[in-house]
Amino acid sequence: CYTRDMLDLKEYGIVMWPEEKIISFREKLLNWYDENKRDLPWRRSKNPYHIWVSEIMLQQTRVDTVIPYYERFLDWFPTVESLANAPEERLLKAWEGLGYYSRVRNMQSAAQQIMTDFEGKFPNTYEGISSLKGIGPYTAGAISSIAFNLPEPAVDGNVMRVLARLFEVNYDIGVPSNRKIFQAMMEILIDPKRPGDFNQALMDLGSDIEAPVNP
C-alpha cells in the first residue's frame, strides 16, 4: 500500500479554515478560473502524455515560448512510443532553444520505462507517475490531477505564494524542506471534484503575486 505521511500543521503554527470556508473558497476560485483562465493548447487536453510534455517544458521556460515548441514536439512525437523510440539527434533538435537538455533525455528514459514497465500505457496513479525518471512531486501532482482527476496537489512556487498570503505563513518558500508544509495545506484545500482545475487556478493566481509574505 502506498502511503504518505500526513503533517500536523498545528505544530507549524498554521490554522486552516473551517470546512464551510474551504468549500466557499473552492467555489470562488474555480468560478474565477472559469472566467479568467488562459486558453493554452495543453489545457485543451486530458491526455497524460500531453500534460507531461507541457509540464516538463514549462519547468524552466516561459509559457509564450513553450507553445510553439509544445505543438512541434507533439507533431514529431505524437505518442509515448514514438518518444521512446526517437533517435537522439531528432530528439535534441526538437528541444533546441529550450536548453536544459537533461529534461528531454529524462523524458525519453521515462517513455521507455512506460513501454517496458507499464505495457505502453501511461501510469494512472500518483505512485506510478512518480516512479518515472525526471518526475518529482509537483509534476506527478499536476499529471495526476489534470489527466486523471485525482485529488493530488501540484505545489510550485506560485501556489506557495498564494498559500503564504492566504494563511499568513512565514516559512520561506525558497527552502525546499518547507515544501511539505504547503503540500499538507493543499491536501486539505484541494477541490475533490475538480482537482486539476483547482491546481491550475492557484498557479494562475500565484503568477500574479510577485513575492511571498515577508517574514
What are these regions (language model features)?
Residues 8-13:
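RNA-binding accessory domains that recognize and position tRNA/RNA substrates
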Residues 14-20, 32-214:
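Catalytic cores of DNA base-excision repair glycosylases
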Residues 25-32:
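Thiotemplate assembly-line natural product biosynthesis machinery
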